Curated annotation (Swiss-Prot):
NCBIfam families: PRK00010.1 (NF000585). This is one of the proteins that bind and probably mediate the attachment of the 5S RNA into the large ribosomal subunit, where it forms part of the central protuberance. In the 70S ribosome it contacts protein S13 of the 30S subunit (bridge B1b), connecting the 2 subunits; this bridge is implicated in subunit movement. Contacts the P site tRNA; the 5S rRNA and some of its associated proteins might help stabilize positioning of ribosome-bound tRNAs. This is Large ribosomal subunit protein uL5. GO terms for biological process: translation. Keywords: Ribonucleoprotein, Ribosomal protein, RNA-binding, rRNA-binding, tRNA-binding. It comes from Chelativorans sp. (strain BNC1). Belongs to the universal ribosomal protein uL5 family. Pfam families: Ribosomal_L5, Ribosomal_L5_C. InterPro entries: Ribosomal_uL5 (IPR002132), Ribosomal_uL5_bac-type (IPR020930), Ribosomal_uL5_C (IPR031309), Ribosomal_uL5_CS (IPR020929), Ribosomal_uL5_dom_sf (IPR022803), Ribosomal_uL5_N (IPR031310). Part of the 50S ribosomal subunit; part of the 5S rRNA/L5/L18/L25 subcomplex. Contacts the 5S rRNA and the P site tRNA. Forms a bridge to the 30S subunit in the 70S ribosome. One of its GO terms (molecular function) is structural constituent of ribosome. The keyword Ribosomal protein applies. GO terms for cellular component: ribonucleoprotein complex; ribosome. The gene is rplE.
Amino acid sequence: MAKAGYQPRLKKHYEEAIRKQLLETFKYENEMQVPRIDKVVINMGVGEATGDSKKPSVAAEDLALIAGQKAVITRARNSIAGFKVREGMPIGAKVTLRKDRMYEFLDRLVNVALPRVRDFRGLSPKSFDGHGNFAMGIKEHIVFPEINYDKVDQIWGMDIIVCTTAKTDDEARALLKAFNFPFRQ
């Protein structure tokens, strides 16, 4: 639980500056129409889980360290013989962040993790889904400072989905640019 009176830096920035900026840019009639970030979903698929059932739980522990919240182990919905996957087998982990934890994670992602990614040239501006949500992938989970590089036995990638209340991709792009997301030109 957060301390009384504490407010994440990005949330404060949104309420004081970004909301007013977007209100003027897109000419909304009401302040409640201004898009905001609704949630962030972090998914870590562990493809090698078919051979070792402990790997999804290790991935869930790493994800919990990164997100600051307990991760849920995801299970296969149906069997796929080609991948040697049975229905109900653990195949990954995911976390859904909302409110203060979401803002704290986005702050660490934009200011600490993304600059540590090797050969990073910016986020693709085409990764929006048409409804104002943004998806991105990270190839190595060790770019986050919470992960101790010496204790990691295997490096996994992760998907990060930023869900917004924006109606269009342009609104969502403007919102995320205001949060200093480093988009490619």
